[in-house]
């Protein structure tokens, strides 16, 4: 008597390995953001000077290449979400890392604008499937109480990659490896290697405790109709179109802009790295703040205001004020995305079951913003070098309006 474990004891013992394992899953998820998405993406802006000289590209063509990578995200964002909902994130992410890594390496074989644009589109087609399934993974492994933190860690992984990609790709990796082409080859091979831990990973458990959307998704048409009927998802899509487009355009243009006004190349790259480093530093604190605040929407609106302020200041800032503007805008980027993903999963009628498709739909809007914002903004540089930042800040204002209209929606 007293020696036989109770059911509660058995549950505690059996659940402990799963509790520990979810942190391993989260570490792989964050590393996937770093090595398979962020570094291969953010290396391009700092390599553009070298690429443009090698391929004889103009400023507008550079903006087109930077923006066109978002084109497939308009479509594959939704497709990738549906695939993740139906096949599971484990298999989806294993395949996506393998294929995105190969496509990223192919960019290094480009010989002109057409081939560069084609390979950039192919990379975007496959890499855009990764973030939504990473955040869906967080939704299936973590409870609502821990979801903000989990998404914050995943977002910090993205920010770490953005920081490293912008900091070392042009000043360290390119000279060391012998040029921009070899940099892309190495980054592609690294992303491909991440396919293995996802392939070997345990299947995700059932719903980790999030309310709403507990039922499995039905037929594809029914799933899409269900998501399309949630008005708040469309408003969040409108919001991310403006805010993501603002950030995408600004990050691609910033190193070129600073070089153009006389900054040394290393300092221009450091400004972009600072944006990403500040974002990485505050990703988890901002996610935790939203948990304590009790209103994701309020946190998102505060973040949008900071992006608007920072990007707007870049249009007129000079000298030390550039660093201030970069810090203000960069403070919230990845924390904003962590809260945004959590907001989608927590929206009434979504939950983890529909999370992939819902995130995919909103990321389609993000891809549209990322596609149109860079070339449109860059084309305004002929009026004055700072005018593109004014345009992109205006896009973020449009996104802020979408957040204002997307009232809180609790299950």
Please annotate each region the language model reported.
Residues 86-96, 291-304:
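Cytoplasmic membrane-interface "Motif A"-like loop-to-helix N-cap segments
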Residues 154-203:
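Helix-loop-helix hairpin linking two adjacent transmembrane segments in secondary transporters
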Residues 351-383:
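A late C-terminal transmembrane helix in Major Facilitator Superfamily
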Residues 44-45, 231-273, 278-283:
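Extracytoplasmic gate region of multi-pass secondary transporters
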């Amino acid at each position: 008597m007293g020696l036989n474990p109770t059911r509660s004891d058995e549950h505690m013992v059996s659940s402990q390995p799963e509790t520990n394992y979810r942190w391993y899953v989260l570490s792989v998820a964050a590393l996937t953001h770093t090595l398979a998405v962020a570094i291969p993406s953010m290396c391009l802006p700092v390599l553009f000077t070298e690429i443009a000289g090698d391929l004889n590209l103009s400023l507008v063509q550079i903006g087109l290449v930077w923006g066109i990578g978002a084109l497939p995200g308009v479509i594959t964002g939704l497709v990738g979400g549906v695939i993740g909902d139906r096949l599971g994130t484990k298999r989806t992410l294993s395949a996506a890392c393998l294929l995105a890594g190969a496509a990223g390496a192919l960019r290094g074989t480009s010989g002109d604008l057409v081939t560069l644009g084609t390979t950039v589109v192919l990379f975007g087609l496959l890499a855009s499937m990764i973030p939504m399934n990473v955040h869906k993974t967080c939704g299936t492994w973590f409870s609502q109480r821990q979801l903000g933190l989990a998404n914050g860690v995943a977002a910090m992984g993205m920010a770490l990659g953005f920081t490293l990609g912008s900091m070392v790709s042009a000043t360290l990796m390119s000279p060391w490896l012998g040029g921009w082409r070899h940099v892309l080859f190495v980054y592609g091979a690294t992303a491909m290697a991440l396919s293995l831990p996802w392939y070997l990973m345990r299947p995700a458990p059932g719903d980790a405790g999030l309310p709403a959307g507990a039922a499995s998704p039905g037929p594809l048409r029914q799933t899409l109709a269900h998501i399309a009927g949630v008005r708040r998802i469309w408003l969040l899509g409108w919001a991310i179109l403006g805010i993501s487009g603002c950030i995408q355009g600004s990050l691609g243009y910033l190193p070129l802009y600073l070089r153009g006004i006389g900054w040394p190349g290393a300092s221009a790259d450091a400004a972009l790295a600072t944006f990403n480093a500040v974002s990485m530093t505050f990703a988890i604190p901002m996610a935790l703040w939203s948990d304590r605040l009790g209103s994701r929407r309020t946190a998102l609106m505060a973040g949008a205001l900071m992006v608007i302020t920072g990007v707007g200041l870049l249009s007129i800032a000079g000298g030390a004020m550039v660093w201030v503007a970069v810090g203000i805008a960069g403070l919230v980027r990845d924390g904003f995305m962590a809260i945004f993903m959590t907001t989608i999963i927590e929206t009434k009628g979504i939950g983890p079951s529909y999370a992939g498709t819902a995130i995919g739909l909103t990321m389609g809007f993000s891809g549209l913003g990322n596609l149109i914002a860079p070339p449109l903004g860059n084309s305004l540089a002929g009026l004055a070098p700072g005018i593109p930042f004014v345009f992109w800040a205006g896009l973020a204002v449009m996104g802020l309006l979408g957040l204002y209209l997307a009232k809180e929606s609790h299950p």
